[in-house]
Amino acid sequence: MYAVIKTGGQQFRVEQGTTLKIEKLEIESGKKVTFKEVLMVADGDNVRVGTPFVPKVTVEAKIISQGKEKKVHILKFRRRKHSMKQQGHRQLFTEIEIVKIKA
């Protein structure tokens, strides 16, 4: 059985036991979180697609850790002006493990 959930403006295909990194959630490590925005659920040949969400279906996950991604370097170079701007960004993420898909 697998499901497609929506969180942080992105969609993820998840199964029980799947570990993935999503946009940062303001929840402590070790706590549980429930995703109610389930776009699709499939169990063998039985596929249910929501409009936009499947009713009465939730996905439970456990927060494993919080962290930052690797740094992305941004360089803006102005030709012939002897000028450049350098900047870095580290995106915050939450690592979760899918515990259960309630369908």
Swiss-Prot record:
GO terms for biological process: translation. Coiled coil: none annotated. InterPro entries: bL21-like, bL21-like_sf, Ribosomal_bL21, Ribosomal_bL21_CS. SUPFAM superfamilies: L21p-like. GO terms for cellular component: cytoplasm; ribonucleoprotein complex; ribosome. Transmembrane segments: none annotated. GO terms for molecular function: rRNA binding; structural constituent of ribosome. Keywords: Ribonucleoprotein, Ribosomal protein, RNA-binding, rRNA-binding. This protein binds to 23S rRNA in the presence of protein L20. Belongs to the bacterial ribosomal protein bL21 family. HAMAP family: Ribosomal_bL21 (MF_01363). PANTHER family: 50S RIBOSOMAL PROTEIN L21, LARGE RIBOSOMAL SUBUNIT PROTEIN BL21M. Part of the 50S ribosomal subunit. Contacts protein L20. This is Large ribosomal subunit protein bL21. The gene is rplU.
